[in-house]
């Protein structure tokens, strides 16, 4: 059986850092599209960028899909593509910001074949621009969620 080929577009936003934040994600497989967004009262831009990726990957129902993640976050893309997150994991995420989210990321990352593509933010990439609008709108909602993993050190 052929693997599903999925495109996952993501972005995070934060007004102040820390401050209210949100993420947006678009998951596409052929003509299927699912859109995700959520806002948090106090968080960071890096947490929202990473949570966008996690949320999209967790939504994939196909086993062992081929996933291309499009992100403007050097933090997320470099951590994976340069292998940093795997060395952080080997060291038990000691003193690493966002360890809760990186552990959650690795659990879902390993279910699929995932590659990351960095895109320049605010540069006219249609899906990145759409995810940015989703993230900003989510961060401005009235009833923002609590980012339970956020700490001032993160």
Which residues are covered by each model-predicted region?
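Short beta-strand scaffold segments in enzyme catalytic cores
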Residues: 22-29
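Acidic two-metal-ion nuclease catalytic site recognized across multiple nuclease folds
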Residues: 1, 140-154
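Short, conserved alpha-helix that lines the donor NDP-sugar binding/gating region
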Residues: 49, 53
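Extreme N-terminal starter segment of soluble prokaryotic enzymes
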Residues: 3-7
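RNase H catalytic domain
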Residues: 10-20, 54-130, 134, 139, ...
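Metal-dependent phosphodiester-processing active-site neighborhood
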Residues: 1, 20, 32
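A short, polar/acidic, helix/strand-boundary loop motif
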Residues: 31-48
